[in-house]
A protein has these predicted regions:
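Compact nucleic-acid interaction/catalytic patches
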Residues: 250-256
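Hydrophobic, aromatic-lined core segments that form the binding pocket/scaffold
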Residues: 48-217
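General structural signal for secondary-structure boundaries
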Residues: 26-34, 53, 145-149, 175, ...
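Secondary-structure boundary elements
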Residues: 78-79, 248-250
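Generic short alpha-helical hydrophobic face used as a protein-protein interaction/packing hotspot
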Residues: 27, 68, 161, 231, ...
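Local cysteine-cluster metal-coordination motifs and their immediate loop/turn environment
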Residues: 223-247
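Generic N-terminal leader/targeting and pre-domain segments
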Residues: 1-59
Length: 256
């Protein structure tokens, strides 16, 4: 079970909550129903001042990625596998704001202890729970409703997993070897079936080492697809890793 300290840490780092104080609840099952999903996307579009439903879909995918990094953080740092099933996790909005930063509501805090003997088995179980039976069905619905490419949606998740990777490697209290082993497995080595009906891991295409970007004067893992965040809000702003500003002349996929 997640103790109070661990719950507090997940709340601080990944906007997790363990109390239902929501004004607006977005459940996985509702995201898998196309008619309900369309209504939810219209609400997100209005709230975030998005230009279209495709941009709203990408923002939903980015917010949903916090479910993934919270579960992976618990697995690696606490050595506890949380229940990341569709029945135990949902996005809760506690106040209306343009940025729309919902919290990850985790209903039951029961966990499975990760040991050296069961680590591989439990990590595969977590990936099945997170991706094959949870994220992938939502991505499929988003694609059907808005025609957004799954390449964009999977890259949204990959970006946050790489962010978690960097966050953990910078923490001297955490064993780097274990971090690298687990996240390399998730990003590159895990078989495609853990993510849905895939022959290959859909995250692996986004795991190349970050190149040096002369324009930004630093190494940046430039996105292959645009997340469309510049199509939200009153001002047109771009992510630092945006392909539109980092490599605008190389056939970048903007409207996936």
């Amino acid at each position: 079970m997640l103790n109070k300290k661990e719950q507090s840490e997940l709340a601080e780092k990944f906007r997790c909550t363990f109390k239902d104080n929501s004004l607006y609840r977005l459940s996985p099952s509702s995201c898998m129903d196309e008619s309900t999903l369309r209504m939810q996307l219209l609400w997100i579009q209005q709230t975030m001042e998005a230009d279209n439903l495709r941009a709203a879909a990408s923002m939903l995918a980015k917010r949903y990625s916090f479910v993934v990094v919270a579960a992976l953080y618990s697995f690696i740092v606490f050595q506890k596998k949380i229940n990341a099933s569709t029945k135990n996790v949902s996005l809760h909005t506690e106040d209306a704001e343009t940025m729309w930063l919902p919290k990850v509501f985790i209903s039951e805090t029961e966990t499975k202890e990760v040991t050296e003997d069961n680590q591989k088995i439990l990590l595969d179980e977590l990936l099945d729970e997170l991706f094959a039976h949870h994220i992938e069905p939502i991505w499929s619905s988003l694609h059907k409703v808005t025609k957004i490419s799954k390449l964009t949606l999977w890259e949204n998740v990959a970006v946050y997993i790489h962010w978690l990777y960097d966050l953990l490697l910078a923490n001297e209290e955490i064993e780097n070897v274990q971090v690298q082993k687990n996240l390399r497995y998730v990003l590159e080595e895990a078989e495609g079936h853990h993510f849905g009906s895939y022959h290959h891991n859909p995250l692996s295409r986004y795991s190349s080492p970050p190149p040096y970007v002369k324009k930004q004067k630093q190494e940046i893992r430039v996105r292959q697809t645009c997340c469309l965040s510049y199509q939200t809000g009153a001002e047109e702003t771009y992510c630092q890793t945006c392909p539109v500003i980092c490599k605008p002349k190389k056939g970048v996929i903007v409207h996936e």
